[in-house]
Amino acid sequence: MYTSRSLFSTLASCLSLATLVASSPTTNQNLPSSKRDATVEQNVFFDINGKEVETRIAKLKAEGYRPTSLNIHGTPTDAKYAGIWIKQDGNPYETIVGANKTTYDAWLDQWKASGYVSTQVSATGPASNAVFAGVMEKIPSIRNWTQICGTSSPYAYLNATGDAPIVITGVSLYGTPTERQYCVLGHEDTDNHQQTVWFPTSSSQDYKTIEPAETTKRFWRPVFIDSSEDKLLASIFDDTSVGNWTVRTDLTASQLQSEITAQKANNMHPIHISGAGSTETQYVVIFTEQATPLERNWHAVGDITGFPDNARVKRDLDEILQKFMKRNSVRQAQVSASINGTVIASRAYTWAESNRAIVEPSDKFLLGSVSKAFTYAAVDHLVSTGVVNLTDHIYPLLGYTKPADPRSLNITIQHLLDHTGGFDRGMSPDIGFIFTTVAQSLNQSTPATLRQLIEYVLAKPLDFEPGTRSVYSNYGTLLLGYLIANKTGETYMSYLEKNVLKGLDVEMYTTPGADHTNDRIVQETKFTSISALTPLSEKRVANVYGGDGAVKEAAVSSFALKASADTVSRFIGKHAAYGLGPRQLFMYRDGTVAGARALAYSMAKLDWAITLNTREYLDENAWNTLVFTDLYQLWGALDSALPL
């Protein structure tokens, strides 16, 4: 799989060309009525030869239709074509069909020299005798693009593009099973577009298992599928919104018309088509409610109340967040500032499609390791009430006296707070994310518990002598969360609510994706892996829903609380952002986990916090610039001007 960023249609057994006019539905749970397509006029063809397709394309071009999908399949001597054209205005375009590689490359170079961009490429046949079809358009906004054909490894494309950010827009599989070839096309990525690309190399990479995994991520969908002659499917998924969608695979020509008719009755448009097979062609089609993805809209809500020039603070803060979110493709965020636990600045930001929630200041975001601040406050309460001492040895306190590494008996509560307990995630796996591994080691089909994880770790050697150096560890706060429950007889969350939160609205972010189907805040990640909830299955889910190896119910004390930025800024007005005790000047805590990024910062007078619904921005430098330069300078200037 390549992770960086469909369309299909088809027609009748007795017809090689048809015109479809589809009206959008009057009701829909996904798209507001104002955002649905009005009337879409399409022209869909399939199972026609080279002479026919040239005639068809010329006629369509003359009538104002534009290509959205073009596919060549079959043998070089008897190539067949399928395509979708839509009637709409647009940039000039050129097409080529049935060209050998020499002719195709010359055509590509000719139109590239005239400022055209390759937008579609398709090939069929063996490597030595392949034939190509393609579309090029004059799109001034695309300044850089890269297309490679004739490679046996699609990952060679990444080497060709180097560090340049690229959105892969098309893939074509051709050649033979023993000498497979790929065409890969990509355009420059100017807005951190999120996608995953699956290049199959064998039948074990079945689209029917890929799609369910990819779509555990809310709003993700297939945008492109290409079929090899032996029916392997290359696919591209992204998180753009087109309302309802569906994919149909393995359709014979005789099944196409009925499928088109059925989908039309549901107001679904075919947007992409691919065929394969030299005898009986089978087709793959993507249907969508919206022919083109929804555009994003900018929203900023909330109040600024605590400064001499509130309007200017609002303007400056909004400019910082708008610039960051648009450049980094971040959809949801909050920023808050408080003094002595009272919120004086609260802004919620949305850069998203109309079928997603507009963020409010009260919405709760996954906090990642900012959750640890609440655990430290809970431990502080345990110490202040005499339940434990910082010098207590953690494992004997929990009833464990025979670890595999005797040095484990020397680990104190203070060591865990200071990240000096002997756990180095640079030497061993990050213990917070090995719940899947623990369950698999026990041949257990149910999720590993925190107790099982602790006992798994106890059977391993430490990475270094406790107390000799500090290395950030999620395991320390897992142990502290277990300690809280073990010594008080309450759940971690119950203890927090009774002794720490004082009415603040903080919750646990649960693991199952089904729990978050209707969440206003979508914690976004493009990555998937084996679910920690079903560790012995092959089921893959979004990392935020257990694909990262974490069971959040067990790891809540380390990185699985959710709250608003307002709540966080108020909390650190009373408690240390980092460390034990009351509020501390110029201390901060940074949190990152799949699907989230957050930061809490105490300055001289101001306490401020930021929450994002993803950590998949351009790079870590983008985050550091946002929080440690732009926001730090803004809040720092305001902080210094506030009265003591």
UniProtKB/Swiss-Prot annotation:
| Single annotated GO MF | serine-type endopeptidase activity
Q: Where in the cell is it found?
A: Secreted
EC number of this enzyme:
3.4.21.-
Q: Which cysteines are joined by disulfide bonds?
A: 149-183
Query: Can you list the GO cellular component terms from the UniProt entry?
Result: extracellular region
Q: Look up the signal peptide feature and give its range.
A: 1-23
Please provide the Gene Ontology terms (biological process) for this protein.
effector-mediated suppression of host defense response
Q: Which Pfam families match?
A: Beta-lactamase, BTRD1
Q: Which UniProt keywords apply?
A: Disulfide bond, Glycoprotein, Hydrolase, Secreted, Signal, Virulence
Anything known on activity regulation? Not inhibited by phenylmethylsulfonyl fluoride (PMSF; serine peptidase class S1 inhibitor), clavulanic acid (beta-lactamase inhibitor) or ampicillin (penicillin-binding protein (PBP) inhibitor).
- Chemical reaction(s) catalysed: a glycyl-glycyl-[protein] + H2O = N-terminal glycyl-[protein] + [protein]-C-terminal glycine
Classify the main location.
secreted
Q: Which residues are noted as glycosylation sites?
A: 100, 144, 159, 244, 340, 389, 410, 443, 486
Annotated active site residues, numbered on this chain, are 369
Instruction: Give coiled-coil spans as residue ranges.
Output: none
Superkingdom, natural source: Eukaryota
Q: What does this protein do?
A: Serine-type endopeptidase that cleaves Gly-Gly bonds in the polyglycine linker of host plant class IV chitinases to disrupt their chitin-binding, and thereby plays a role in lowering the defense responses of the host to the fungus. Degrades Z.mays Endochitinase A (CHIA). Has low proteolytic activity on Z.mays Endochitinase B (CHIB).
Similarity section: Belongs to the peptidase S12 family.
List the protein's name: Polyglycine hydrolase
